[in-house]
């Protein structure tokens, strides 16, 4: 894989997070391919850029502030298609003033069109969502193994 492809996909992921922080639907929507697929969670699974942006605005109404940080990630490129996994951490304040943190990762596929990378699909996998002190349950708790 060319470093330029990985860098361009990393920039896409960071542009997405920046749009979340600034509540910028135009910037956020421009990250998606026209026929993309987004799985935000059970019952929140949509296809097509317009439907994806509509779901995003509905989801964002639950919050008054979000800071999304992109952590580590990996990318595998195969021509004009690629896949990857990116870990994120979000600090948020809900509309009811409840504060919390989200630790999760996205499983992604990407497509290159006219020399530019877009999300072809993103699926959110929540590892933790709860109080900032991490006192809530972890979805990936392996302590019983």
Residue ranges and their predicted role:
Residues 1-3, 20, 103-105:
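Residue-level recognition of hydrophobic positions within alpha-helical transmembrane segments
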Residues 1-7, 141-145:
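Basic/polar N-terminal segments that are highly enriched at the extreme N-terminus
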Residues 5, 9, 48, 102:
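Hydrophobic (often cysteine-bearing) scaffold residues that line and stabilize catalytic clefts
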Residues 5-21:
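Short, aromatic-enriched amphipathic alpha-helices that serve as compact interaction elements
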Residues 12-13, 25-88:
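A solvent-exposed, acidic/Ser-Thr-rich amphipathic alpha-helical stretch
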Residues 22-27, 116:
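Surface-exposed helix-capping loop/turn segments at secondary-structure junctions
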Residues 57-145:
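A beta-strand edge to alpha-helix "cap/lid" segment located at domain peripheries
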């Amino acid at each position: 894989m060319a470093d330029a492809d990985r860098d361009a996909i990393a920039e896409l992921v960071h542009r997405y997070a920046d749009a979340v922080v600034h509540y910028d639907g135009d910037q956020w929507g421009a990250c998606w391919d026209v026929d993309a697929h987004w799985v935000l969670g059970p019952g929140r699974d949509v296809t097509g850029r317009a439907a994806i942006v509509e779901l995003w605005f509905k989801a964002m109404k639950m919050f008054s502030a979000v800071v999304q940080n992109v952590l580590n990630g990996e990318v595998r490129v195969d021509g004009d298609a690629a896949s990857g996994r990116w870990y994120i951490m979000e600090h948020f304040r809900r509309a009811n003033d409840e504060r919390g943190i989200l630790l999760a990762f996205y499983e992604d596929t990407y497509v290159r069109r006219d020399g530019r990378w877009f999300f072809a699909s993103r699926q959110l996998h929540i590892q933790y969502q709860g109080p900032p002190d991490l006192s809530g349950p972890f979805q990936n708790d392996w302590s019983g193994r």
